[in-house]
Regions:
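N-terminal secretory/targeting leader peptides
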Residues: 1-17, 25-26, 30-237
Length: 237
């Protein structure tokens, strides 16, 4: 069920992303859907918006043609990259710096923190806000462990998870702001606002393929599209 969150442009704005993920009643239905597999997500953490960054400027999908881009080892990410005309190069994240530096790849995709925490801003000077994915991190709990807790212990455990979500989301915004400042002022990275809709149009086929192969994803997709519509025209799209 969680594969749906790898779909490019599942969320079309950060406002929609946060509204869906903060809808506790709705998300608990998704979290509990894996009970039969013996685990359950307890809460989510913001991992930001994934964007392309490279050694050359990317202003439109056409600029990606022929580029070699490191993506996550997920079918949706590989298919997305190919839809833009680029060559997807799945590899360990720890190899990205050297691969860009040596010209093995032209760029990668991630949030702003990759530029500073992993020093990718030293070798990739252009960061384009195409906002192709918003994939949450999840806190996973073993169901046997959770069911073994007393009522009071369970209450405390879930409250701690809730508080950790609130604090992480606050700190995330602070860290992104700081990373962008460091990347611009100390690394010389150029941040580029692009026509997000132009990128969205290129991956319609990828979205349709994901929905076709995953029946569980369709209701979640439909729900998120309703929320997306509430924020059309906002958040830079």
């Amino acid at each position: 069920v969680y594969e749906i969150f790898s779909m490019p442009y599942l969320f079309t704005s950060e406002d929609a992303y946060h509204e869906v993920m903060n809808d506790t009643d709705y998300m608990n239905k998704i979290f509990s859907s894996t009970d039969e597999q013996g685990f359950r997500a307890l809460t989510w953490y913001n991992a930001g918006t994934r964007n392309f960054y490279a050694k050359k400027e990317i202003d439109s999908p056409e600029d990606m043609k022929g580029l070699k881009i490191r993506v996550q080892q997920r079918p949706a990410s590989v298919a997305m990259c190919q839809a833009f005309g680029a060559a997807a190069s799945p590899m360990s994240f720890g190899e990205v710096y050297t691969a860009i530096q040596q010209g093995v790849i032209d760029g990668a995709e991630n949030n702003e923190l990759a530029l500073t925490s992993n020093k990718h801003g030293e070798v990739a000077k252009y960061f384009s806000y195409n906002k192709h994915q918003m994939i949450p991190d999840l806190l996973i709990g073993n169901l046997s462990f959770l069911n073994g807790l007393s009522k009071e212990e369970r209450k405390v455990f879930y409250k701690a998870a809730e508080l950790s979500n609130e604090e992480e989301c606050k700190q995330w915004d602070v860290q992104v702001k700081e990373a962008k400042k460091v990347a611009q002022e100390q690394m010389g990275v150029k941040f580029i606002d692009v026509d997000v809709l132009a990128f969205q149009k290129k991956v319609k086929g990828v979205q349709e393929s994901i929905l076709k192969d995953n029946a569980q994803a369709k209701p979640i997709y439909d729900h998120i599209q309703k929320v997306n519509k509430k924020y059309e025209g906002k958040d830079g799209e």
